[in-house]
Design a protein with these regions (language model features):
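N-terminal "arm"/small-domain region of PLP-dependent enzymes with the aminotransferase-like
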Residues: 1-28, 236-239, 367
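Helix C-cap/helix->beta junction micro-motif
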Residues: 92, 153-154, 325
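Phosphate-binding glycine-rich loop
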Residues: 27-74, 88-92, 98-100, 173
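Active-site phosphate-binding strand-loop segment of PLP-dependent enzymes
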Residues: 104-194, 199-207, 314, 369
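A generic structural signal for well-ordered alpha-helical segments
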Residues: 42, 89, 149-151, 280-281, ...
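PLP-dependent aminotransferase class I/II
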Residues: 34-39, 47-50, 57, 111, ...
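Conserved PLP-anchoring active-site segment centered on the Schiff-base-forming lysine
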Residues: 61-119, 125-127
Length: 397
């Protein structure tokens, strides 16, 4: 029996070389490698500023703080996302207003956001999640206005949660080059990793200045500057009560090696996704991801499928059957409105989120990583097909 994990990390490039350079230098925390990673990342996504932090959660928190979101404010958040997207608002005393998403893409659409903005005119901003590696429709397409136009008309600030979506494009525009601020993840299972880490990018100088200070205790001097400049290291000011969100150079060293291969890794994921699509299309009772971008513009962070009710196979049972064949899976996501904290705090009912509910009842994510072989993809697809056929015959459920 094959053993195919849900995720397999690739770190066989310049990672050890760059880590050794940091160790030989003797300066392990934030310094030259972090600055180089920031510069190269900004160039790649087409942003003026990039600021490395220790997680995408930290980036989201800093973004919301820098945009002035605070106690009593309300912010739109899609319910189909990881809890970090909403929890950072609670850190600041703000409230998430959860929204349903489009079935098949799990993205906010201009129509969904327009209706929500009309219903909740007091909302200050939106957390725009680019789900699964596919960018949401930010710009006008085919004469239909995009999410940014809706935001501008209603005075909504835009924080893009692009934890899934690097590198990615839509209509020639790179994710990270459009909104007020965009946050990326370098967690272990992402396209590129630093182990733990994230990046915040923006074209707004004021936001960049604020984030740079707040990511390290609200101190107005970088730690590298404090210990390398002529001015004494202890001569600095604390301008606000900040956070401990900086990225060490050891992590940045890994990130630099990974960044060199970002497109290679993305292409490997795309190859697997195309094979999944070819093999699984047409299977009864199965919905595949709906593509709104070219496959080559998709980051392919995950490959989610949805078992429809007529499949006669529950998601949990399918996961069990695949595990029996050595296949790892995951679920993206249990919607936030089903989490006890959000249910109890905001009295949310499932009827408000029909598309997310439809997805949640049958969704699972198949293995997807750049070193996944064609034979392994075929093995997974055959196993999924066997599960569906057995369910139709009544031998599983």
């Amino acid at each position: 029996m094959k053993k195919i994990p849900y995720c397999r990390i690739t770190c066989d490039g310049n990672e050890l070389r760059y880590i050794k350079e940091v160790l030989d230098c003797g300066w392990l925390t934030t310094a030259g490698k972090t600055q180089e990673l920031e510069r190269r990342f900004a160039e790649m996504v087409g942003a003026r500023y990039a600021l490395a932090v220790n997680s995408c959660t930290a980036a989201l928190h800093l973004a919301a703080e820098a945009m002035g979101i605070g106690r009593g404010d309300r912010v739109f958040v899609p319910t189909m996302t990881f809890t970090a997207t909403a929890e950072v608002l609670r850190y600041l005393g703000a409230d998430p207003v959860l929204l349903d998403v489009e079935y098949g893409t799990n993205l906010l659409t201009p129509a969904i956001l327009e209706a929500a903005a009309m219903r909740y005119p007091e909302v200050k901003a939106v957390m725009m999640v680019h789900y699964g590696g596919q960018a949401a429709q930010m710009d006008t397409e085919d004469g239909h206005e995009g999410l940014l136009e809706v935001c501008h008309r209603h005075g909504l600030g835009v924080i893009e949660d692009a934890a899934h979506t690097f590198p990615a494009r839509r209509n020639g525009r790179t994710v990270g080059s459009l909104g007020d601020v965009t946050c990326f993840s370098f967690y272990a299972n992402k396209t590129i990793t630093t182990g733990e880490g994230g990046m915040l990018v923006t074209n707004d100088e004021a936001i960049a200045r604020r984030v740079k200070v707040m990511r390290l205790h609200g101190i107005n001097r970088d730690i590298w500057d404090r210990f390398t400049a002529v001015k004494p290291s202890w001569e600095y000011d604390v301008v606000a009560p900040g956070f401990k969100y900086n990225m060490p150079d050891l992590n940045a060293a890994v990130g630099l090696a990974q960044l060199e291969r970002a497109e290679e890794f993305r292409q490997g994921r795309e190859r697997c996704a195309r094979r999944y699509l070819a093999n699984l299309t047409g299977l009864p009772g199965l919905d595949l991801p709906v593509l709104q971008v070219r496959p080559e513009d998709h980051a392919w962070h995950i490959f989610p499928i949805v078992l429809r009710p007529e499949a006669s196979l529950t998601r949990n049972r399918c996961i069990e059957l695949l595990a029996e064949r050595g296949i790892g899976t995951s679920v993206h996501y249990k919607p936030l409105h089903r989490m006890s904290y959000y249910q109890q705090t905001y009295e949310l009912g499932a009827e408000r989120f029909p598309n997310a509910e439809r997805t949640w009842q049958g969704c699972l994510s198949l293995p997807l990583f750049p070193t996944l072989t064609d034979d392994e993809v075929d093995y997974v697809c055959a196993a999924v097909g066997d599960c569906l056929k057995a369910a139709v015959c009544g031998s599983v459920g």
